[in-house]
Design a protein with these regions (language model features):
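Internal intein/HINT superfamily modules and their associated LAGLIDADG
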Residues: 1-149
Length: 149
């Protein structure tokens, strides 16, 4: 419907039509973990879409952490990123997208981890998380020594 008073159109999407449209795009109805769904190919094949997808996944199911450990009597703190999901294809899709951008990640059961400082910096630079808490933590980490003692 065209509005005559302004240069704009009104678009109305009903629930059924919208769901059918999303299904045509390759998305599925229902529990994503039970169905073990990954990221649709049309998203993975477009760099902009895949980056937006990774950003959204990280912002909802990702996090940052400090890995503290001892070596030769000295306590060290290292920074890391993590993405967690019980959906194996989703983890795999997330990892694929990172690899396309040259970011190394390591998996363990339901988690992916990014440990290298350069890769973490690249991650924040490329994917531009909307959760600035993680960016602030990383900057704080960079301003310190990795030794904790």
């Amino acid at each position: 419907m065209k509005r005559r008073s302004v240069n704009a159109s009104v678009i109305i999407v009903t629930g059924v039509n919208f769901v059918e449209y999303l299904m045509e795009l390759g998305l599925k109805i229902g529990n994503k973990v039970k169905q073990q769904v990954g990221v649709p190919e049309w998203i993975k094949s477009d760099r902009g879409f895949s980056r937006a997808c990774v950003r959204g996944l990280f912002d909802t199911d990702g996090g940052t952490f400090y890995h503290r450990h001892w070596v030769n009597g000295h306590k060290y703190c290292h920074f890391g990123l993590t993405f967690t999901s019980s959906c194996k294809p989703l983890l795999s899709s997330f990892k694929e997208c990172l690899e396309l951008d040259g970011i190394r990640s390591y998996g363990e059961k339901d988690c992916l981890f990014v440990y290298r400082v350069g890769d973490i910096g690249s991650f924040f630079s490329i994917y531009k998380t909307r959760n600035l808490k993680h960016v602030h933590r990383f900057r704080r980490y960079l301003s310190r020594s990795t030794r904790c003692d």
